[in-house]
From Swiss-Prot:
Classification of source organism: Bacteria, Bacillati, Bacillota, Bacilli, Lactobacillales
Named cofactor requirement(s): Zn(2+)
Name assigned to this protein: Oligoendopeptidase F, chromosomal
Record's cofactor remark: Binds 1 zinc ion.
Gene (UniProt): pepF2
Residues at which Zn(2+) binds: 388, 392, 395
Highest taxon, organism lineage: Bacteria
Residues the record marks as active site: 389
Record bears the keyword Hydrolase: yes
Keyword Oxidoreductase part of the UniProt annotation: no
MF terms in GO: metal ion binding; metalloendopeptidase activity
Family: Belongs to the peptidase M3B family.
Function field: Hydrolyzes peptides containing between 7 and 17 amino acids with a rather wide specificity.
């Protein structure tokens, strides 16, 4: 039975008093920051470029207030997440969100004033006369890089007005898909009739009973088939918004606009898709192996997620902590001390309680600990989640300790590398420690499935996303028929399973929320691949390799993303890191195939 919040031992909860010792102090700080923001328009707007001194002063003031806003927000957000039923912290969350909006509105003048009125020559002279501006040089350099794509204040204001309209395709999808659409009733493994939901679909697809999987799969996609024209319209409109925004800002494409916003060259995307295409035979081999293990001659898409091992790993939290510390010790003393601090100083909210937010995350702000939320159940997945979130938290801690606030964060493009590197090292460690063939079989299957779902599947999404934006930009209509055909062909190309014999999968595009995120998913694939490459260097490389990795963790956003990850020895415009990742996939697939030949799966 799930406990109430007050029944959880204090040692297993996060210590948010290190942010604000009392709620009253949070409320006092909130009012103070609101007052500071109320003065911005009067004191700063229109004066940013009066002189080098005003540029420096207003920039420092903006960053100082931003730092305070983030601290207020994370306290409210985490208080709310620990028990979402508490009205007080729901109110705190609303107030903190409103403060974020207020901050954005107050400093809306900053970029347009900077880019419209400041020439690089003038800025260069100011740098010579006021050395302190150099502390923000990379931030200003990023702004100058946007210059040809920035809108005037008047244009920006006009386009800000229909902002809610531009959000409506994704919001309509979300409401329709999560609230309005009701899936049919199906039978579970016990033969009980249950209503199919997004929440239970995953567990039904992992059922050992093939009839249960088939029924859930067909029931789910019958709904998407029935509503395909509505989903096509929301997706088409969303793509049009992306293409429109790119066009008016003088980008060549929506993809260029999305990637350049994070200073990621388009070549990274192209190298990924090219590398994936070259190694699709490996995925086809893995599918054939699943087919052999499950003894299914007419293998279908609903057989993809069936666990190949029923080995039940169990870890209590104390064992999980010990294992995480052992595994992450490979990074050296500096990293290990931070991991120890995370456990000793209560950075982690461990157990599930009534009203607690589901899932897991790493959070915090520049001025706080890098807190983590878990919902520990003692499974192998929970151990992987622990080291994953620890990867984010130690990345954040290194960044915040080594960079000023202006560079004290990092883009999602870099974030997933630090977390999945830890997952890869955990896999390597568990495999190294295990001589039991059934254990090795389970671990290899776990990693190969993660690779398939993160690298191959997300790349399939990325390829689909690129194609639909290109087709819309050429003036073609994204009808449901076109989307079905494109997705079915891609799925056959990736998995080697006939589109004709798997007709339901052509509707999968309709259920993927990431297609509304604007060229986001490719980062999962690049991140996992880079992490596989780095983990191999850390485990089998030199002390220098490990130090280079720490240098990447410490860099934050003090340089462009590709320059930061290059510190860890990864060139993401080259196929080398992908080749290394696929080589590891093949190595582990080879071992799994040999174990199957020996009958270990039986």
């Amino acid at each position: 039975m799930v406990k109430n919040r007050n029944e959880i031992p204090e040692a297993l909860t996060w210590d948010l008093t290190t942010i604000f010792s009392t709620d009253q102090k949070w409320e006092t700080e909130l009012e103070k920051v609101k007052k500071e923001l109320s003065l911005v328009e009067t004191n700063d707007k229109g004066h940013l470029l009066d002189s080098a001194e005003t540029l420096l002063t207003i920039t420092k003031n903006m960053l100082s207030i931003s730092q305070k806003v983030e601290k207020l927000y994370v306290y409210a957000s985490m208080k709310n997440d620990q028990d979402t039923r508490e009205a007080k912290y729901q109110d705190y969350q609303s107030k903190a969100t409103a403060l974020y909006v207020n901050f954005g509105e107050s400093y809306a003048f900053y970029e347009p004033e900077f880019l419209k009125n400041l020439q690089k020559e003038t800025y260069g002279k100011w740098l010579e006369t006021l050395q302190e501006l150099k502390n923000y040089d990379h931030m200003f350099e990023r702004l100058f890089a946007k210059k040809e794509h920035i809108l005037s204040q008047k244009e920006g204001k006009i386009l800000a007005a229909p902002g809610e309209i531009f959000e409506s395709p994704s919001e309509t999808f979300e409401i329709f898909d999560n609230a309005d659409v009701k899936f049919p009733f199906v039978k579970n493994e016990l033969g009980e009739k249950i209503q199919l939901t997004h929440g239970n679909y995953g567990s039904l697809m992992e059922s050992e009973n093939r009839e249960v999987r088939k029924a859930a799969y067909e029931a789910l996609y019958s709904n998407y088939e029935q509503c395909q024209h509505t989903y096509a319209k929301t997706l088409q409109t969303n793509v049009k918004v992306h293409n429109f925004n790119a066009q008016i800002r003088a980008y060549d494409s929506a993809r260029q606009a999305a990637l350049m916003s994070n200073f990621v060259p388009e070549k990274v995307y192209d190298v990924l898709i090219e590398g994936i295409h070259q190694h699709l035979p490996l995925l086809h081999r893995y599918i054939e192996l699943r087919k052999k293990i499950l003894e299914i001659s007419d293998f279908k898409m609903y057989d993809i997620y069936t666990p190949l091992s029923n080995l039940d790993y169990k870890f209590n939290y104390t064992e999980g902590v010990k294992k995480a510390q052992e595994v992450l010790a490979i990074f050296g003393e500096e990293y290990s001390q931070k991991v120890k601090a995370a456990f000793d100083e209560r950075w982690i909210d461990v157990e599930e309680n009534v009203g607690k937010r589901s899932g897991a995350y790493s959070g915090g702000s520049y001025d706080t600990k890098a807190f983590m939320l878990l919902n520990w159940q003692g499974t192998l997945d929970d151990l992987f989640t622990l080291v994953h979130e620890m990867g984010h938290s130690i990345h954040s801690t290194f960044t915040r300790e080594n960079q000023p606030y202006v560079y004290g964060d990092y883009p999602i493009f870099l974030a997933e590398i630090a977390s999945t590197t830890n997952e890869n090292i955990l896999t390597e460690t568990l495999l190294k420690e295990s001589n039991d063939e059934k254990e090795r079989f389970a671990l290899l299957n776990h990693w190969l499935d993660s690779f398939r779902g993160t690298v191959f599947r997300q790349s399939q999404f990325a390829e689909f996303e690129q194609k639909i934006h290109e087709v819309d930009a050429e003036g073609e209509v994204l009808t449901s028929e076109f989307l079905n055909s494109l997705y079915g062909e891609l799925n056959e190309k990736y998995y080697g399973l006939s589109a004709k014999e798997n007709p339901e999968i052509q509707f999968e595009w309709a259920k993927i929320p990431h297609f509304y995120y604007n060229f986001y998913v490719f980062q999962y694939a690049t991140g996992f691949s880079a992490a596989s490459f780095i983990a191999e260097k850390v485990v089998h490389g030199s002390v220098t390799d490990r130090q280079n990795y720490l240098d990447y963790l410490k860099a934050g956003s003090s340089a462009y993303p590709l320059d930061v990850i290059a510190k860890a020895g990864v060139n993401m415009e080259s196929t080398d890191y992908l080749e290394s990742a696929f080589k590891l996939f093949e190595k582990r697939l080879n071992e799994l195939e040999k174990l199957v030949e020996k009958g270990v799966h039986l």
